[in-house]
Amino acid sequence: MLIKQYPFYLKATTILFGISLLVMMLYMLADLLVPLAFAMLLAILLNPFYSKLRNFKIPKLLAIVLTLTTLIIFITAVLYFLSSQMIQFGDTFPALKAKGAQIIIEIETWIQHTFGVSIQKQMLMLNDAANNSKGLVGQTIGSLFGLFSVLFLLPVYIFLLLLYKELILNFLYEIFSEENTNNVAEILNQTKVAIQSYVVGLLIEALIVAVLNCGALFILDVKYALLLGIIGAILNMVPYIGGIIAILLPLLIATVTKEGYSTQLGIIIAYSIIQFIDNNILVPRIVSSKVQINAMVSIIVVLLVGSLWGVSGTFLSIPMVAVLKIIFDRIEDLKPWGKLLGDEIPTQHMGQIWKRRRRNKHIVQQL
């Protein structure tokens, strides 16, 4: 209640300064915070398995090692499966390259006849674009090295988070007064449930989308249907923009391996139907219901955090907002912010309710 005694301009200035400082810190410390955020996400997800091992009287260090080993085996199995499919793709890469070169020549000829741009001028434009993209290539290579460093740090962070779980929980309880113990416990429990439910729901959604993608590509007789369907499902896990990117790969493969454009049209129709099913049935029932964040906030946060942390930020943004909503809903002064993030739409806003109260009060006074 004390914060409401300050003038509005002072509160607004303090809040804006705090937000600016927070954004600057998130951007500058991205290399540290992104792997730590992923590690916290995975540690919360792995906690039930770790707790079950502890219930069997397995020593703490051994339980953590077994938990991490299980995670590494699962990730290795998925990567092995994808790499085996990519090897088949690599075997036919020369043929795909030749077909792609032929299509490029046809496009260049069409541009020359349609727009009057000579092939030589087109090549100069492409060379300029390639020179301008050298910086982008360097950034991409840097991102790959960053990814390897994240993969190295993840097991270390997860190990430490599980090892010091009781210490961290004790700290969170001690920084608040004893009368707030129930609120802290409720926030921690709901955060754990929301993150676990969200990630599990996301994996279930990805599995269903992978089956639908592969089935559609098999029916359309697209090469590497299994690989493309699974990659599409993985990309689809990136909120809002992943599904759009996922359709480009099968379209590209169909263009260089098929004659005509009927297959490409079939891919667009099939993926549009799958996206409709995903966005209107799977996501609301399996994923969004777990975090209770409205679509407007989700899109804005995905774009904002994505601009700070890249693709990793788009994936982490929804769980981060879900945790903020849980905290806001438990603090009296921040409850309006929790309602703003939520997906419950009131039939009347508070301005209408207060206006009706004043009118009723005025009528009573007249009587």
Regions found by a protein language model. Name each.
Residues 264-367:
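Hydrophobic alpha-helical transmembrane segments of membrane transport and translocation systems
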Residues 49-56, 62, 77-153, 165-166, ...:
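Juxtamembrane membrane-interface segments in integral membrane proteins
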Residues 11, 143-257, 261-267:
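Alpha-helical transmembrane segments and their immediate interhelical loop/hinge regions
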Residues 4-22, 83-105, 139-156, 211-220, ...:
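Hydrophobic alpha-helical transmembrane segments
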Residues 13-21, 25, 62-78, 148-155, ...:
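Generic alpha-helical transmembrane segments of integral inner-membrane proteins
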Residues 30-38, 219-230, 258-266, 293-298, ...:
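Membrane-water interface of transmembrane alpha-helices in multipass transporters/channels
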Residues 1-84, 158, 322, 326-329, ...:
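Anchoring transmembrane alpha helix of integral membrane proteins
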Residues 28, 32-36, 48, 52, ...:
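Membrane-spanning helices that line or support transport/gating and their immediate boundary helices
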